[in-house]
A protein has these predicted regions:
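A nucleotide- and high-energy phosphate-metabolite-utilizing enzyme signature
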Residues: 1-166
């Protein structure tokens, strides 16, 4: 079956890379949707896992729950994935409400980043930054484990998250 093949996962990863190239801002850190460990990566890992397991559930949260119940994701992975995805979606929602338009990246202005962290209820940008990086890393590690490692047949080495763009 195509959905169970390594070729399928290579196509998923290639599609994600194409989206990053075409829609990304050029700053992986700021790209909360298309960047490494971003919203789209979380959606792709769940959708690819759904296809492999023949789970046809359109709602991301319900699909993640079903994958957890079927033991595709461990309880810890599923919990962290859902928390991280929820965190990024909250960031997106707050940005969208403030800008009154679709938003796929954090603001590049440090003062606007600080304002975002306050709107999200943080006392400081540093604490928000830590949680943001943790959420992105969590999603990326899970994506690596279920899409990248699987399509190459061996565990892949993780590269450290580049914070120099922050």
């Amino acid at each position: 079956m195509l959905f169970r093949s390594a070729e399928f996962l290579v196509k998923i990863d290639s599609m994600l890379e194409r989206i990053r190239t075409e829609r990304g801002s050029g700053s992986d850190f700021l790209d909360l949707k298309t960047g490494r460990g971003g919203i789209i990566e979380a959606e792709f890992v769940v959708q690819a896992s759904q296809m492999r397991e023949s789970i046809w559930e359109p709602k991301w949260q319900h699909a993640a729950d079903l994958l957890q119940r079927r033991r595709v994701f461990t309880d810890a992975e599923a919990t962290k994935l859902k928390q991280s995805y929820g965190f990024l979606r909250r960031c997106e929602s707050v940005l969208r409400r403030y800008d009154n338009k679709a938003v796929s990246a954090l603001p590049s202005d440090p003062n606007e980043q600080r304002k975002l962290s306050i709107r999200l209820g943080y006392d400081s940008f540093e604490i928000f930054h830590r949680d943001y990086v943790d959420a992105r890393e969590t999603i990326h590690v899970i994506y690596q484990r279920y899409v990248i490692s699987t399509n190459r047949g061996a565990p892949s080495a993780l590269q450290p998250f580049n914070l120099s763009e922050a």
